[in-house]
Amino acid sequence: MNRIAIIDLGSNSIRFIIISVSAKGIYQLIYQEKRSIRLAEGMSDDSPFLTDAAQNRAIDCLKVYAHLAKVHQVTKTLAVATAAVRTARNGSSFLKRVHSAANIPMTIISGKQEAALGFSGVIHTIDTSEFLLFDLGGASIEISLVKNKKQLHSVSIPIGAV
């Protein structure tokens, strides 16, 4: 069995899960946690930068998650950063700090990728086949049009709850 850690670094919180995947592709949730780190705190149109304090909160949390992954004998880590890092002028340098401090390589995903991942995460939990999916995050909202359980169109708008 492989153990996979998944990290979703959002504008307001970090989600962390560990799953075990069998040879048959069946997965089991081993661990999950969500921490509010307020990464986008202090960002604005006039100051599109992640603050040092927000970066440090995120890095401290990610160090804990890296340790938990090691304790749980994780074989692969998938880590993504969303709207706050995507729009921050210092987003790339922040991810270099994350990699150096916590040894977690992260990928900045586009709004379209974020919408696709949100769709993939919920499609098997919804009984209806045609709907609009709204995924409200801290710094963006992804909206997907779904017909016949297929994502036909999606848009990411840089307006969030924070």
Question: What is the predicted function of each stretch?
Answer:
Residues 12-14, 139:
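Conserved Rossmann-like nucleotide-cofactor binding loop
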